[in-house]
Amino acid sequence: MQGNLPPEAQEKIEELQDLQETAQQVAQQKQQAETQLRESETALETLDDIEGDTQMYQEVGELLIETDYDEAYENLEEKVDSLEVRVETLTKQEERVQDQFEGLQEELQEMLQGGAGGGPMGPGGPGAGGA
């Protein structure tokens, strides 16, 4: 189906596919970061309800290491701050990829409507499904 498209249009389609894949990866990373952020915020709220002299353990890899309240609280605050920055960065990256995708899509539609007729893309011009 892409065989009868001009090479420039085929390149744009490949770029669109790459951008779509990138957008999916960024969205997945953002979702994971948001989940970790919610979990960390919940843990911080839980720490607020615990007395400072309560015996605590922190997960380090496969181990649970004894820690004190202040250290646990500080570590969680740092993690929340870091995750907030990560989510913000991924949101901006998601927007950039979306803008690139839309721009490339417009270029492709113009290319197909202006140059090569009968392309498979878009709800474009009249009679745009023929040979």
From Swiss-Prot:
Q: Where is the composition biased (Low complexity)?
A: 20-35
- A single cellular component GO annotation: cytoplasm
Chain spans, region Disordered: 19-41, 112-131
Kindly indicate whether the keyword Cytoplasm belongs to this entry: yes
Which cysteine pairs are joined by S-S bonds? none
For bias kind Gly residues, which ranges apply? 114-131
GO terms, molecular function: protein folding chaperone; unfolded protein binding
- What are the protein's UniProt keywords? Chaperone, Cytoplasm
Note the Pfam families from the entry.
Answer: Prefoldin_2
Gene3D superfamilies assigned to the protein according to its UniProt record, in alphabetical order: 1.10.287.370
Q: Where found, per UniProt? A: Cytoplasm
Q: Quaternary state and partners of this protein?
A: Heterohexamer of two alpha and four beta subunits.
Q: Which HAMAP family match?
A: PfdB (MF_00307)
Entry similarity comment: Belongs to the prefoldin subunit beta family.
NCBIfam families attached to this UniProt entry = gimC_beta
Q: Tell me the function of this protein.
A: Molecular chaperone capable of stabilizing a range of proteins. Seems to fulfill an ATP-independent, HSP70-like function in archaeal de novo protein folding.
Record-given protein name? Prefoldin subunit beta
Q: Which organism is it from?
A: Natronomonas pharaonis (strain ATCC 35678 / DSM 2160 / CIP 103997 / JCM 8858 / NBRC 14720 / NCIMB 2260 / Gabara)
